[in-house]
Design a protein with these regions (language model features):
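Extracellular loop and loop/strand-boundary signature of outer-membrane beta-barrel proteins
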Residues: 9-11, 53-57, 92-98, 106-110, ...
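Gram-negative outer-membrane beta-barrel transporters
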Residues: 350-353, 370-461
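Surface-exposed extracellular loop regions of Gram-negative outer-membrane beta-barrel proteins
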Residues: 131-132, 179-191, 233, 238-256, ...
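Transmembrane beta-strands of outer-membrane beta-barrel pores
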Residues: 2-4, 16-20, 29-31, 40-46, ...
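Signature of Gram-negative outer-membrane beta-barrel scaffolds
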Residues: 172-286, 415
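Outer membrane beta-barrel strand-and-loop segments of large Gram-negative receptors
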Residues: 152-156, 198, 206-208, 317-323, ...
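Transmembrane beta-barrel wall of Gram-negative outer-membrane proteins
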Residues: 17-44, 55-91, 99-123, 127, ...
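Repeated loop/turn-to-beta-strand initiation elements of outer-membrane beta-barrel proteins
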Residues: 33-36, 46, 78-81, 115-121, ...
């Protein structure tokens, strides 16, 4: 959460580092009533490298920047307005050989209203935009410019009701319009080996209602429980291919293509009930047991390119041929503190059961493919693991050690003869160590160590 601007006096804060600099400005617009905060930072490894005469950076550019803004207006004791915005971009340019740029921009307007001592409300309007660009400049045969984008328009209302000292109820509603522009390629001149092309656009409306309660049953036992009702509908303008075998779409077996007008409903809506439950039981003043169950539904899918060496990832909505990912997760953990909370320890185990998991056919072509559903396979998956943590938060030496053992598998017809196989996200072992030593008021030493199992890999067994 970004801090609020100072409503009493103007001020600034900044820092100049070896690789980046930052600057923050804040102050009142109307004293004690309306404030602002502006912050920005930029790396300059490329500038310093060129100034130092590093040949490998002579024609190359690499940096990122981000800008943040926030403004708070106190209308009265019961009403406040919050405005915030963010913009950031990563840039990598390899001379005249290639370039990559990707960035995010968001803007939020929020109204906070207090109805009384027991209930308050937040109504928010949120805009977000993610864009990715990749290309080869110039007018040679390999020149091209690729771009993709996702825009979201989100409206939501959230309520919190302090019903009594034992119960805190939260409920609300939200609606998001997703606009996907999976890819567009343009060229410079007639020499390029590529042709100008734009993949089909996708739009969808995602809505949800939720209700939850945090209940304290006794000094030792508390729990949270609730439910979320989600609704997802793909809408036009767009086209849908009809295949001879809808369960196994083949781009060589398209019977017809149906066109839909702007905001027309495309296919059936996906409606899901998502229950959540968690509990905490305090064994004594230093230890407790926690457990939870969650059902989650993901309607947006990340399609990662399997052939291009660049991160040409594509986001797509659930649709006629791509069903929502459904996950059921259970977990239980033991937590204990030692020596007056100087040391915190925990051990947790979890299990996930996943349905409608996506993977790709052998040699899948995802780049500039307008029938991408023909490259996908559907199945199920599981994930299980153990997480252990030891944390020291007091004294001159602080830090933590974390270890995770996990196993993530998929079972998809058409891959590995239908037998389970490790997911690309599988990491059997993950060990992290973070430490900090405060020598005095001026000197602090820090050290980090990370070990992780590599990606699952299949090797050829013969030439």
């Amino acid at each position: 959460r970004q801090k609020d601007g100072n409503s009493k006096q103007f001020g600034f804060d900044g820092g100049i580092g070896n690789l980046s600099s930052r600057l923050t400005l804040e102050g009142p617009i109307i004293k004690d009533k309306w404030s602002f905060l502006l912050a920005g930072r930029r790396t300059y490894y490329d500038i310093l490298g060129k100034a130092a005469g590093l040949d490998e950076l002579e024609d190359n550019t690499m940096y990122f920047y981000d800008l943040n803004g926030k403004s708070n207006l106190v209308i009265n004791n019961n009403n406040r307005i919050y405005l915030s915005g963010y913009m950031g971009e990563d840039v990598f340019e390899l001379g005249e050989s290639m370039y990559m740029r990707w960035g995010n921009a968001t803007a939020t307007a929020r109204w906070n209203h207090i109805f009384g001592d027991k209930i308050f409300m937040n109504i928010s309007a949120i805009f977000s935009n993610y864009d990715y660009k990749l290309g080869v400049p110039g007018d040679n045969a390999d020149n091209f410019d690729w771009s993709s984008r996702i825009k979201d328009y989100n409206g939501k209302a959230d309520f919190t009701w302090f019903a009594n000292p034992q119960n805190t109820v939260k409920f609300g509603v939200n609606t998001i319009r997703h606009e996907f522009r999976p890819g567009k390629i343009t060229t410079n001149g007639d020499n390029s080996m590529f042709s100008d092309m734009e993949l089909a656009h996708y739009n969808a409306i995602e809505s949800a209602l939720y209700l939850s309660n945090e209940q304290k049953l006794s000094d030792l036992f508390s729990m949270q429980y609730g439910v979320r009702l989600s609704h997802f509908q793909q809408v036009g303008k767009g086209e849908v291919n009809i295949y001879a075998d809808p369960e196994n779409p083949d781009k060589n077996e398209i019977i017809e293509t149906i066109s839909y007008g702007k905001n027309d409903k495309i296919g059936d809506a996906f409606v899901h009930l998502e229950p959540r439950f968690s509990m905490k039981y305090t064994l004594d003043r230093n230890s407790s047991v926690k457990g939870s169950y969650n059902r989650m539904v993901q309607n947006l899918h990340l399609i990662s390119n399997t052939q291009s060496p660049t991160p040409l990832d594509i986001w797509l909505p659930s649709s006629t041929y791509i069903k929502p990912l459904k996950v059921d997760q259970v977990s239980i953990g033991y937590f204990r503190n030692f020596q007056q909370n100087m040391y915190e320890t925990s051990v947790e185990v979890y299990y996930k059961d996943m349905h409608n998991v996506l993977d790709y056919i052998e040699g899948a072509e995802l780049f500039l493919n307008d029938a991408i559903e023909t490259e996908l396979l559907h199945g199920s998956g599981t994930s299980k693991g153990l997480e252990a943590l030891v944390k020291k938060s007091k004294g001159k030496l602080t830090g933590w050690v974390g270890y995770t053992w996990s196993k993530t598998e998929r079972e998809i017809p058409g891959i590995n003869n239908g037998n389970p196989y490790p997911s690309s996200y599988d990491r059997t072992h993950d060990l992290s160590l973070v430490s900090s030593y405060q020598l005095n008021d001026r000197w602090n030493f820090a050290a980090n160590f990370v070990y992780a199992t590599g990606n699952p890999t299949s090797y050829p067994v013969a030439k």
